[in-house]
Design a protein with these regions (language model features):
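Substrate-binding cleft and catalytic face of glycoside hydrolase catalytic domains
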Residues: 1-98
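Glycoside hydrolase catalytic-domain groove-lining segments
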Residues: 73, 77, 81-84, 105-149, ...
Length: 182
């Protein structure tokens, strides 16, 4: 939620961090009421996007703090069946993600890591260093949605890269969007 960010960074106030963890539980509850099970969550989509519209980036320290001290404990209490994955990783900054994953509390906090876009560039190195995690790809690059032969070849190359480097899932959810939006 944009009200939890200032200057496009998540506010690192314990009240806001706990509120955000509670939001996850509310969404999981709402989905459950609709008969939709949630088996895994990631703390934020594209947490390294610096855009010209309001965003919510995170520092490595903030990512560790939120996942270790707030999200994982809250879910363990209220939704122990839901796994926590680190993601989505949309940066090729190995140093940042390595800093997060090297925290000694992370193996007890997350079960996997989700990648998309530039994050795929560091997948092989991270998987080699951290083989204990499950790895997934979370959003296919769809470009301008042309879905022509050239786009198919590009997507096939992406699938080959992610699956060939140990991802257990390849997600192309954006392929089902309506042309021109809703």
């Amino acid at each position: 939620p944009h009200q939890l960010a200032v200057n496009d960074y998540f506010i690192q106030d314990p009240r806001y961090l706990q509120t955000y963890a509670n939001y996850f539980c509310k969404f999981i509850d709402a989905y459950k009421e609709q008969g939709i099970p949630v088996s895994m969550v990631m703390f934020q989509n594209e947490s390294w996007s610096y855009t010209n519209y309001p965003g919510c980036a995170w520092t490595p320290e903030g990512i560790i703090r939120f996942n270790v001290e707030y999200l994982a404990p809250t879910l363990k209490k209220r939704h122990p069946e839901v796994k926590v994955y680190l993601g989505t990783i949309n940066t090729n900054r190995y140093d940042i993600i390595d800093q997060v994953l090297s925290d000694p509390r992370m193996p007890e906090t997350i079960q996997g890591v989700g990648f998309q876009w530039e994050g795929g560039q560091i997948l092989p190195r991270l998987r080699a260093k951290y083989p204990q995690y499950k790895y997934v790809q979370t959003e296919s690059e769809c470009g301008w949605g042309s879905f022509d032969w050239k786009a198919a070849e590009h997507t096939f190359g992406l699938m080959n890269h992610y699956l060939g480097n140990g991802c257990e899932e390849y997600t192309f959810w954006n392929a089902i969007l309506y042309d021109g939006g809703f």
